[in-house]
């Protein structure tokens, strides 16, 4: 994309306070004219440097730190100080910085969030604000909000209930909305709904920043969520995107089903994970040379991620011509009690859909040997669940077994890339949820494991939805997104073991996703932004956030010389 000219931005701020506004601050990149006219001359050292040099300075500071948690704090402090520079740093090397601002480091940051909290980066709305949520929203300084990421902190990554400390997730997620998708950060709002926590360690921690009582559940919880959705949509408009993040299984599906046709909303753990997993499967099919409807897919896990993927796989198989009933027969799920089969006790409605006539089995190794899947997908956050025997069996059943260890963070991965490639002698088609280093095999080949990161999905979806004012987001959007992502994977990438485009191309991938969403939205009469733009790519691209510093001096321009004459005498 061509670099844009600096945007002119009006501000009444002057002096010291301007240097404390992260939206306006340029640090040492302020020109001499700006320093003098904005009354900040003398507050900064006399050196004037470019943003490129500023990025280099941050990277050098970043690299001298010894822990990822300290690197996370460095970047968050930068975000609080100079927003443009923060995003310029992230975009300079997305592959390097994404694991710090999001998975896996954000998991550690959430565990330590009571220590990491510096200043407000979003809104904390507690159950005790019920009846006054509209007033709490008024505390946020921005009047125009187009995207909200909200969590109640009950199921943070694979770490469980972190309560109020889960705020690190919406903050990190929205940072990627901008870095990877170009959504304007000033139009993004992270929100944590604090209804308490079941985490005993947090309840006893004197430094914990959230409510110190058990989670509120039932009708009171539902009424609280209803009020929040109504208040947010009322204040920011029905087109405001509200993304649900890291809600527990008991709430995730029912809240999605409850709100999806009433508000502009989606659940990334269900739909985003599904989209990126299906994108990986579609890319893998170019290696196996067969169709998705030819696969037998076994899931280790039957929570929101597994069920979300399963439903989208069914939709993709239907698109290939298979009936929904026959597509479901090709999908098997394993939860904490074993294989999901008909007649098994205490199956939820969501799990019942994928229950088949089969004997009950509990051991995953035995289940793999019995089902003989062509694709094995782990989303249960059980580290090491894919044992050496399971990997050997997958390689015995299949010439090119598809093995996805998608659980986060790294410690929860079902197997490592090295284990998978070594045991299967490089025949496995592997993807993971967290990043793994390249693996060199005994035969000299080096394979680059694909990272099935949701950040391939949600930034582009958000950009497209916001750009055209899509009122509701159905599952078709996520199948379309999966197809677009898989199309960006070249044959060379596949030969290297990659099932996803390189992360350093993610902004371009997000643009393609957004353009496709916008095209479909106008074609299906679902867009609300009019008049319809003729060139959809130009339209979307023009709305993407630029890290170029804004021009904040007043607009100065000349008048004709004759009208500038100074009158010195009173006309007689």
UniProtKB/Swiss-Prot annotation:
Cofactor(s) listed in the protein's UniProt record: Mg(2+); Mn(2+)
Catalytic residue positions: 102, 173
Chain positions with N-acetylmethionine modification: 1
Predominant location: cytoplasm
Site label Important for activity, positions: 269
Any one GO MF annotation of this record: identical protein binding
Modified residue annotations for Phosphoserine: 336
Quaternary organization: Homotetramer.
Role, per record: Catalyzes the oxidative decarboxylation of (S)-malate in the presence of NADP(+) and divalent metal ions, and decarboxylation of oxaloacetate.
Protein name: NADP-dependent malic enzyme
Organism: Mus musculus
Lineage: Eukaryota, Metazoa, Chordata, Craniata, Vertebrata
Gene for this chain: Me1
């Amino acid at each position: 994309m061509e670099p844009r000219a600096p945007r002119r931005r009006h501000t009444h701020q002057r002096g010291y306070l301007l240097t404390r506004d992260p939206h306006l601050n340029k640090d040492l990149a302020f020109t001499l004219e700006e320093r003098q006219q904005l009354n900040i001359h003398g507050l900064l050292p006399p050196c004037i440097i470019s943003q490129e040099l500023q990025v280099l300075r941050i990277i050098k500071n970043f690299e001298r730190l010894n822990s990822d948690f300290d690197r996370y704090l460095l970047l968050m402090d930068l975000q609080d100080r100079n927003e443009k520079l923060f995003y310029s740093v992230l975009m300079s090397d997305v592959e390097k910085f994404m694991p710090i601002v999001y998975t896996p480091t954000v998991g550690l940051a959430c565990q330590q969030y009571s220590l990491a909290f510096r200043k407000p980066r979003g809104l904390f709305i507690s159950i005790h604000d019920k009846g006054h949520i509209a007033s709490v929203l008024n505390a946020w300084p921005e009047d125009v909000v187009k995207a909200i990421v909200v969590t109640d902190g009950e199921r943070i990554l694979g770490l469980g209930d972190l309560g109020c400390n889960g705020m690190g997730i919406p903050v990190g997620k929205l940072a990627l909305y901008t870095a990877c998708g170009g959504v304007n950060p000033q139009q993004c709002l992270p929100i944590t709904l604090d209804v308490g926590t079941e985490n005993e360690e947090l309840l006893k921690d004197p430094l914990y920043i959230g409510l110190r009582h058990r989670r509120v559940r039932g009708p009171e919880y539902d009424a609280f969520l209803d009020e929040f959705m109504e208040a947010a949509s009322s204040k920011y408009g029905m087109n405001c995107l509200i993304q649900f993040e890291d809600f527990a299984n008991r709430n995730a599906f029912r809240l999605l089903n409850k709100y999806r046709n009433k508000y502009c909303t989606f659940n990334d753990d269900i739909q985003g994970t599904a989209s990126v997993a299906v994108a990986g499967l579609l890319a893998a099919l170019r290696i196996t040379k067969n169709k998705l409807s030819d696969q037998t897919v076994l899931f280790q896990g039957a929570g929101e991620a597994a069920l979300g993927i399963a439903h989208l796989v069914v939709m993709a198989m239907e698109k290939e011509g298979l009936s929904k009933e026959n597509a479901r027969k090709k999908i098997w799920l394993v939860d904490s009690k074993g294989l999901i089969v008909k007649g098994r006790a205490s199956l939820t409605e969501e799990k019942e859909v994928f229950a088949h006539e089969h004997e009950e089995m509990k051991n995953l190794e035995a289940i793999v040997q019995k089902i003989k899947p062509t694709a094995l997908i782990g989303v249960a956050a059980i580290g090491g669940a894919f044992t050496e025997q399971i990997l050997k069996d997958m390689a015995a059943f299949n010439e090119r077994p598809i093995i996805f260890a998608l659980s986060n963070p790294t410690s929860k991965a079902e197997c490592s890339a090295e284990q998978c490639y070594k045991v299967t002698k490089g025949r496995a088609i592997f993807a993971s949820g967290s990043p793994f280093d390249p693996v060199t095999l005994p035969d000299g080949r080096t394979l680059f494991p694909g990272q099935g990161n949701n950040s391939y999905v949600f930034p582009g979806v958000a950009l497209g939805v916001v750009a055209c004012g899509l009122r509701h987001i159905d599952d078709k959007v996520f199948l379309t997104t999966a197809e677009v992502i898989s199309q960006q994977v070249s044959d060379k990438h596949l030969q290297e073991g990659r099932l996803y485009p390189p992360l350093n191309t993610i902004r371009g991938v997000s643009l393609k996703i957004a353009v496709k969403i916008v095209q479909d939205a106008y074609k299906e009469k679902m867009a609300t932004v009019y008049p319809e733009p003729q060139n959809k790519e130009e339209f979307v691209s023009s709305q993407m956030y630029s890290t170029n510093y804004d021009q904040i001096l007043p607009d100065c321009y000349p008048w004709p010389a004759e009208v500038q004459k100074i009158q010195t005498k009173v006309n007689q």
